[in-house]
Amino acid sequence: MRSGILSKVKRIVIKIGSGVLTCGDNGLNKPLMGSIAAQVAELRASGRQVIIVSSGAVAAGRKELGIDGRPRSIPQKQAAAAIGQSRLMHAYEEAFEPFGHKVAQILLTRDDLAHRGRFLNARATLDTLLSFGVIPIINENDTVVFDEIKFGDNDSLSALVTNLAEANLLVILTDIDGFYEANPRTNPDARLIPLVRQITREMERAAGGSGSTVGTGGMVTKLAAAKKAGQFGVPTLMLNGRNPSLLAEAFAGREVGTLFLPGKESLNRRKHWIAHTLRPSGKIIVDDGARTVLARQGKSLLPSGVVRVEGKFDRGACVRVCGTDGTEIARGLVDYSHDEITRILGHRSGEIEAILGYKYGDEIIHRDNLVVL
């Protein structure tokens, strides 16, 4: 199964974590970066296109600034990113130069992908770089980002880039051998799971916390990334990036690491963008009847099923749809503002025009703009 999946792959997103790229407090691990570059060059020689999502800027910059451990404040982190990003890119240039490959830097924030026009422009830029044989190196723009526009971690970013780039495989290089049934750092008898057909809540609960002192992600965020990628039909391969040949071995047919299979019912790319890239502006609380219809039948959300509205938002905004118990059941783009929904909630669609004096449509959220979670 694995060899059949990997043999069909043409465009790959490879996420490389800080725990792989750095030598603890001693900055970037340039010999290992050279090994990764050699393996990526093999993939390119086989006709595959590669995009790298790379952590490491903050870790590289903190050494230059003499900061021990993780930066203690956001300004410190952003200063470390500012000095470290140029050093990170220079290290990639040095790593790929022996193989004749050029690299390009792309720095993103969530806003860049949430705005549909900028999203499509970023996709066009990626396509153009790849057509010239360039290897894009993508990172979050840590120097200017703040909570409202940050991805949170590069695992999440890598899953979104997989959608952005229309890739057909996500590879996560981490500092352990793959996904285990328990934390291998605290349980030496933990068993590696080579194949995951479905990410369960039990797996998410067992995933634990952050794995290193230099990164912000842990197994929880890696599972979330694999789940997001799987929702639009893309498998994820998790490998130990500290092994200097494991990436090449995986594509040579050796069953290493953990392969996460995509879900049977995948989202189209637009719905994936709605569910995972847009930041919700508010909440719409629905009754049990509407909850059942949305979850089981994939219908549009009508005003008759709405109980109340939380937050302020305009028409076209992304909102959470929640049950009366607070559980989020869907996300979608609204056809009416918070004020308009407040006025028409609980009413039949045929009454909308009489209440508002106009009507955009029968639905609060049309099913084409609604993603059940």
UniProtKB/Swiss-Prot annotation:
EC number(s) per entry: 2.7.2.11
Residues that coordinate or bind ATP: 15, 174-175, 216-222
Subcellular location: Cytoplasm
Residue ranges occupied by any PUA domain in the UniProt entry: 281-359
Major location category of this protein: cytoplasm
GO cellular component terms attached to this protein's record: cytosol
Domain of life: Bacteria
Family, similarity comment: Belongs to the glutamate 5-kinase family.
Function: Catalyzes the transfer of a phosphate group to glutamate to form L-glutamate 5-phosphate.
Protein name: Glutamate 5-kinase
Gene this chain is encoded by: proB
